[in-house]
């Protein structure tokens, strides 16, 4: 895990032996499971350390304290939620993943990593956000899903408690995308708080963290039915 350790040193973070072992196990299980179902196109040891593990942990630049209630929307193979949980064991983590096969991997890897305080939710975000058990219950929500910011706002902000934040990793020039998302962010009860540049070893490709703050309750009609936020963003 030399690449990960080096990258974390730039953040002033060091891993203990247990955490190093967990990341090693995570890599081995990811590659093994990926041979049976498609979890990720990134499988080389160095690339996983940088593009999955370090990229996930870079969310600490947004001021994560380590004791939050965090929801990872569209978690896939567990990024960024599980690397953050390894780093901060006190986080109460929800992993929301609609694809059953991926959700099964998340359940299995959570056990193999010896993690507690993790809930796997295998449902669509649009449906889950209307459930009182999850709606406006999280202090932090994140998603690495490849989606327009307007769509992401509708799929993430309804989970945020007022005063909570959404952390959305993005890359490249996002000014136009953020302009398009202004309506969706406002309708969900949010505001753009700040945009943070990510400049870490191996991640010098224009990565950014978009921070949204939840300032009022999301109206009951949002999010709209499954698939609509992606097909017809609120712009």
UniProtKB/Swiss-Prot annotation:
Single Gene Ontology MF annotation: rRNA (guanine-N7-)-methyltransferase activity
Listed under GO cellular component are:
cytosol
Any keyword S-adenosyl-L-methionine?
yes
| Keywords tagged on the record | Cytoplasm, Methyltransferase, rRNA processing, S-adenosyl-L-methionine, Transferase
Q: Does the record's keyword annotation contain ATP-binding? A: no
Q: Where does S-adenosyl-L-methionine bind?
A: 74, 79, 97-99, 125-126, 144
Q: Which Pfam families match?
A: GidB
Similarity comment: family membership? Belongs to the methyltransferase superfamily. RNA methyltransferase RsmG family.
Q: Function of this protein? A: Specifically methylates the N7 position of a guanine in 16S rRNA.
Name the chain's protein.
Ribosomal RNA small subunit methyltransferase G
- Tell me the organism: Dehalococcoides mccartyi (strain CBDB1)
């Amino acid at each position: 895990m030399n690449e990960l350790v080096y990258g974390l040193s730039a953040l002033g973070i060091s891993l203990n032996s247990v955490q190093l072992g967990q990341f090693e196990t995570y890599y081995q299980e990811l590659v093994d499971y990926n041979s049976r179902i498609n979890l990720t196109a990134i499988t080389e040891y160095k690339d996983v350390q940088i593009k999955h593990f370090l990229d996930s942990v870079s969310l600490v630049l947004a001021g994560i304290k380590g004791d939050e209630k965090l929801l990872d929307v569209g978690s896939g193979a567990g990024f960024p939620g599980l690397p953050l949980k390894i780093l901060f064991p006190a986080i109460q983590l929800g992993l929301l993943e609609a694809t059953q096969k991926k959700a099964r991997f998340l359940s299995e890897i959570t056990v193999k990593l010896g993690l507690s305080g993790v809930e796997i939710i295998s449902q669509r975000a649009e449906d889950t956000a209307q459930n009182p058990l999850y709606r406006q219950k999280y202090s932090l929500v994140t998603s690495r899903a490849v989606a327009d910011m307007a769509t992401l706002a509708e799929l993430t902000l309804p989970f945020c408690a007022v005063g909570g934040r959404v952390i959305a990793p993005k890359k490249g020039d996002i000014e136009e995308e953020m302009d398009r998302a202004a309506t969706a962010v406002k309708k969900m009860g949010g505001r753009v708080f700040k945009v943070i540049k990510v400049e870490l070893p191996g991640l010098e490709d224009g990565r950014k963290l978009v921070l949204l703050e939840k300032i009022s309750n999301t109206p009951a009609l949002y999010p709209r039915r499954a698939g609509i936020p992606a097909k017809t963003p609120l712009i």
